[in-house]
Amino acid sequence: MNTKRAYKLQEFVAHSAAVNCLKIGRKSSRVLVTGGEDHKVNLWAIGKPNAILSLYGHSSGIDSVTFDASEGLVAAGAASGTIKLWDLEEAKVVRTLTGHRSNCVSVNFHPFGEFFASGSLDTNLKIWDIRKKGCIHTYKGHTRGVNVLRFTPDGRWIVSGGEDNVVKVWDLTAGKLLHEFKSHEGKIQSLDFHPHEFLLATGSADKTVKFWDLETFELIGSGGTETTGVRCLTFNPDGKSVLCGLQESLKIFSWEPIRCHDGVDVGWSNLSDMNVHEGKLLGCSYNQNCVGVWVVDLSRTEPMSGGATQSNSHPEKTSGSGRDQAGLNDNSSKVILGKLPGSQKVDPLLKETKSLGKLSVSQNSDPLPKDTKSTGRSSVSQSSDPLVKEPKPLGRFSATHSSDTVKESRTLSSTGSVSDSPHRVTLTSAPKSASGISTVVPNAAASKRNFGKANPKANPPVVNKEDYFPVIVPRTEPIIEQASESRAELDIIGRTMPYSLQSKAADSRRLSSSRNEPDLPTSSLLERSQSQPIEPITLQDGNTYPSDEGGSWDTAERTNKESKCRVFGRFNSRSLVRSPPRNHDENSDLISYNANRDSSPTESRKGGRLHSLVLNRERRGRFSNFEGPVSSSSGGNMTAPNSRPSNMLKQRGNHVPVDQGITSASEEDIVADIMGQHDQFVSSMHSRLAKLQVVRRYWERNDIKNSISSIEKMADNAVIADVLLIVNERPEILTLDTCTSLLPLLTALLGSNMDSHLSVCLDLLLKLVRMYGSQIYSSLSAPSSVGVDIEAEQRMERYSCCFVEFEKIKACLPSLARRGNLVAKTLHELNLTFQEVSS
C-alpha cells in the first residue's frame, strides 16, 4: 500500500505526436480521452497502458475533447474549427459540425439535454443541438479566445472564461449575456461550480482563485497569490474546500473563510484535468506525447484528515473523502471489500408507524462504532456508502414519529449497547435531526434556482453500479439457534424485539403461551425485523437492490443467487418449534396465536385447561386469500395481511371441546404452520424495508427523479403508496418534471384492490390535476412558437407525457366509481376537476 500523500499511478505514450488535450470521464473516473497533433482521438482505461479505442477522421490536430454525462459520446474540437461527435460504442462519427473559423479549444456537454457548447479562438461560443445537427445559437462578447466553458448544473446558464481575462455568464433561455466578471488579471484557465451552493470558483493565469456569488454576482473573495497559474480546480464533493492544481503542486483552499489549508508537491507538469473519486484526487497531465496519471490521497491532507476524526460528535465536519477507499487498479473491488471493517454493518432503522404507511426513518442510519454512546442526539459515523454523504433530511419523509417510537427509543438508550452480533442496534434518542432545515427542490419557474436540483450532492446525476460499495451479506444464522439454546442470549434478543414476540421465540419449545395474547401491530413485527440483517432482493427486470447501506448491486445479486432457497427471515419456523418433552404438563397452555391480526383461532377451556384447536382445512386455507401489495421479488414474498380469511371462525367466544388425544406431532404442526406464515409476513416486511431503504438513499440526496425511477422498477404497490403519501405532503417537490415521472406510477396504483392505496393515489392525482391540468391541456391546443426555444421544447415534451397519462387515468375512473367504497367522494372531485381543466 502506498503511504505517500501523492504518487504517480502511471505514465504512457498516448500519441505519435504531441498531446494537446485530455479529459477524465466524470461518471466512472475510470476512463480518459486524449487528443493529439497526430489528428487522433484515443480512449484509455486508467491503469492500462494500451488504448481502448483510436478514433480517426480529423484532418487537423485535436485541441479539445470531452465526455458526455453517460460516457457514451465524445466531442472533439480540432484546430480547423471542426467538431466531431463520436459514438464510443460504435466507434464511429455521429456528427461532423462546422462553424468556427479558428481552433476549437473548449467543449462541454449539457448536463441532461442533447446539447453541447464549444468555444474557439475566433472569440465565439456556440451551442449545438445534437439532434438537429447544427448550431442553434452563437454568443459573441469575448475579445479573445474562449479557453474554458461549463454549463451550470441546472442546465439554464453557461459560464465561459477567455484569454481576455473575463468570465461571462450567459442565459440559455433568454439567449443573452447575464453578467461578466472582470477581476482577474490573467487569462481564465479553469472554473467549477459548488456542489450545493450558488457559487462559482475561477482559476486564472494571474495565480489567484476567485469565488463569485451567482445570486448577487458579487466577488466573495480571492485566494492566492500562488507561485504559478491555476491550471485546474475542482470542488471537493463535500463542498467545503476547493482543490487547485498548479504547475507542480496541489493547493487546498476553503472558501468560508478563504484560506489555504494544505499544499502537496505532486510532480505533474502540464496539468490538464482533475477529478475526485472515492476519496482520491485523480489528476492527468501531459508532456510532449506522454500522459501521466497522478493520485493524491485526500484523507491525508488538511482539512479532510482533521475532519474525519470528529465524525461522531460533529456530523457536519465529516468529509466524504476521509473514508477508507480503494486504489485505482483492476482489483479495486477486492480492496474495497478488504477495507470495510466488520463493525460497519448498517442497521436498517426504518419503521412504519401506521399500517398503510407513514414512513418513519430513524435519524441515524449509519452504523455506530462500538464505543459510541447515546448522547441525546443522532450520532453519525463514517459510512462507506458513497450515496450517503452528509445527508440533509427532506422534512417529513424522515420526521414522522409517534410517541411510542420516542418511548421505545428512550428505552433502548437506557439499556446500553446491545451485542457484537449482526443484530447491532443503533442507539438514538428523541428525534432531533428531523427538525433540521428541509432541502426544497425548487420549481422550474423560480427565478432563483438551486443547483441541488440537478446536482444535489457532488455525485453525478447518473447513478452507476460502480458507485456502490460492496458489502458481504453474512451467511451464518447463529442468532436464533443461540436463542433457543442459551437463556443469556434470550436477554440480548429481549432488548431488540418486542416482549410478545420474544416470549413466543423463547417458549415455543415447550409449547406454552400466555392466555388471550393481544394482537400484534405491524410496528411490532417490524421491530423484530430491525434486529435481523436484510438480504438483497432481486426484481424481475434484473435490477438487484442492496439491503444494507453499503451494499453493492453485484455482490448483493451474487449473494441472492446463492441463497435462493432461503426465506428472508433469519430463521426457519420449523427450527423454532421443537417436539415437547414426553412429561409435558397438560396444564400448560398451548400457543394461541394467529398471524392475521383481525382473527384468532377458536379457543376452548375444559377442566381449567386452555387448548387451541385449528382444523386441518383451516391450516390448508388460512392464508389463501390475503390481499396485499403487488410484489415482483423473486423470493415469493408475502405481503402484510390486510383482509380476513374467509374460512376462519369469526367469533372468539365460541368454545369447541377438544379431545384429550391430540398428539404432540399435530401440536407441532399447528405451531409450525402459524410460525411459518409469520416468517412469510416478516420476510415481506424485510422486502418492503429493503426497497424503502433504496428509495431513502436517493431521497437523502434530494434526487427525487431517481427515487421515483427506483420505485417504478420495484413494482410494489405498498412501497409506491408509502412514498406517495409523503410526496403528497410535500407540495414543493411537485414540479412538472416530477409530475411526468409520478403519473405512470399513479396509473399503475389505480389497479390496486386496496382502498388505502386508492385513497393515496387519488388524493395525489387530484392535487396534480389542479396544479398542472389547465397548463397541459391549454398548451397542447396552443399554436407552436416560432424560433428555437430549448426550454419550451422540453416543456412541451413533458406536457405530452402528462396528457397521455391523464387520458389513461380518465379511462380507469368509471370502473373505480362502480366499486362504491370510501374513495367515491375523491373520485367525484377528480372527475369534476378533469372536466374543468379540459373544457
From Swiss-Prot:
Gene ablation phenotype (knockout): The double mutant ktn80.3 ktn80.4 exhibits normal growth, but the quadruple mutant ktn80.1 ktn80.2 ktn80.3 ktn80.4 has a severe dwarf phenotype, with small and round dark-green rosette leaves as well as wide and short petioles, probably due to cell elongation defects, and associated with a complex cortical microtubule (MT) network with stable entanglements. Plants missing KTN80s have a disruption of KTN1 recruitment at MT crossover or branching nucleation sites, leading to an abolishment of MT severing.
Q: What function is annotated for this protein?
A: May participate in a complex which severs microtubules in an ATP-dependent manner. Microtubule severing may promote rapid reorganization of cellular microtubule arrays. Confers precision to microtubule (MT) severing by specific targeting of KTN1 to MT cleavage sites such as crossover or branching nucleation sites. Together with other KTN80s, regulates cell elongation by modulating MT organization.
> What biological processes does GO assign it?
microtubule severing; regulation of unidimensional cell growth
Annotated region (Disordered), positions in chain:
303-340, 357-435, 501-561, 575-648
Name this protein carries in UniProt: Katanin p80 WD40 repeat-containing subunit B1 homolog KTN80.3
Family per record: Belongs to the WD repeat KATNB1 family.
Localization, per the record, is:
Cytoplasm, Cytoskeleton
Give tissue specificity per the record: Expressed in siliques, flowers, leaves, stems and roots.
Q: Superkingdom of this entry's organism?
A: Eukaryota
Q: Where is the composition biased (Polar residues)?
A: 307-334, 375-385, 411-435, 501-533, 589-602, 630-648
| UniProt gene name | KTN80.3
Q: One GO molecular function term?
A: microtubule binding
Where is it mainly found? Answer: cytoplasm
Q: Name one GO cellular component term.
A: Cul4-RING E3 ubiquitin ligase complex
Spans of WD repeats, please give: 14-54, 57-96, 99-138, 141-182, 184-222, 225-265, 267-304
Cross-referenced PANTHER family: KATANIN P80 SUBUNIT, KATANIN P80 WD40 REPEAT-CONTAINING SUBUNIT B1 HOMOLOG KTN80.3
Q: Supply the InterPro entries for this chain.
A: G-protein_beta_WD-40_rep (IPR020472), Katanin_C-terminal (IPR028021), KTNB1 (IPR026962), WD40/YVTN_repeat-like_dom_sf (IPR015943), WD40_repeat_CS (IPR019775), WD40_repeat_dom_sf (IPR036322), WD40_rpt (IPR001680)
The UniProt keyword set, sorted, is: Cytoplasm, Cytoskeleton, Microtubule, Repeat, WD repeat
